[in-house]
Amino acid sequence: EIKNVTYFTEIGLTLIVIALFFKVSAAPFHIWTPDVYEGSPTISVLFFATLPKFASLIFLFRFFIEMDISSYSSLLFIFKFVCVLSLLIGAYGAMTQTVIKRLLAFSSINHIGFILLSILSFQFLSQGIFFFYLIIYLVTSFGVFSILLTLRNNLGEIKLITDLTGLKTHNKSKAIALLVLFFSLAGIPPFAGFFAKFFILTASMNEGLIYLSLIAVLSSVIAAFYYLRIIKTMFFNEGEDTLQENSMFYHNVTYILSALFVTFFAFYPDPIIFIINNYFS
């Protein structure tokens, strides 16, 4: 009878975890994400790519720890499997995209893989580091989508990566801000995203998740390619500048603060780590 209770408990926990994976767009439960990102207005994407995901990931983190998911071998395997798929599908899926919001959708799936890796490394990872990665990712995403909200072309919202051609000359401050934000998303030092990934990889290596750590490093290398492709389009591609401004004051404030935040961390990391460790640990 005890075995039956444990069996049904494990089934119930598995269904809850799968529902959460679907909610946060973890692979292979991500199929809806690229189409929704592409088809929705940018302001809507900005919302559901940040705030609901933040709440769902916190719940998933607490659920993993409080329910002691690591003691269930099948559930632990599912977590690792989904982590690997998210890292690889997110990285490889973004490489072939020409629509910028679809690319960002696959990018978000890749970052979910890193967040799942942080959850799997919880024994060697303080809650502060989990929240640090989550906050860095969400702030950076908020900044990127805020810039996209302010840019249009003759047909309306910009859709293709090539629509960003000439941004360097059209609005240098937005081009530089996107450069900083994409460098952070790619995990390129000295920006905040690099330290966030470094802390998680260190914890996962200490946990003994060597193969997951190597896959995460590989996915970061691949991710750097498609972020750099966008940067190349903004700064080096030649073509007609069809960009138009649709700036609101709060959009400009948001992207400037986001870029300053990930840059500030490169030079003064201690205050931010102290705050996160004290308020989220």
Regions found by a protein language model. Give the residues of each.
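Alpha-helical transmembrane segments of multi-pass membrane proteins predominantly involved
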Residues: E1-S281
